Amino acid sequence: VANAATDEAARGGMEKAELAKLRAHLRRSFGCDLINVQPHSRKKDAAEATLGEVGLGEIIADEEDGDRSFFFEMKVPVERAELQSFLRKRFGNDKLTVVARMKKTDSVELNNGPDHIGVMTVDDAQAKSFTLEMAILDIDLDDV
């Protein structure tokens, strides 16, 4: 089994241990134990995050100079005024807050209490949807 995981990593796929750590990290970040992470159905160096039957977004792996990192992207189809309540309801976490960024009008920050989760950028000129962009470094996964 160890060889299978090593072979999978050598091919660029994600190992089961990596998927478990990513799941734990997303659960902790969003304060929601219902988040799941599984291998992407079409991309070998990616994973899909779900909440029950609902697709949340995609996690892409990147390796540079021997350091492996990940990028989570999630589309949120609501306007700015509804953003915080939508995310709190979706994840069942009233500690999620959407905060304006200094000197930036095209994006907001998403936090879980005092912890920064990521930046949400406006997708269209009417600001009717946002995309959460969240970098996940290998050190973020060390303590999960």
Where are these regions (language model features)?
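Terminal leader/tail segments of proteins
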Residues: 2-144
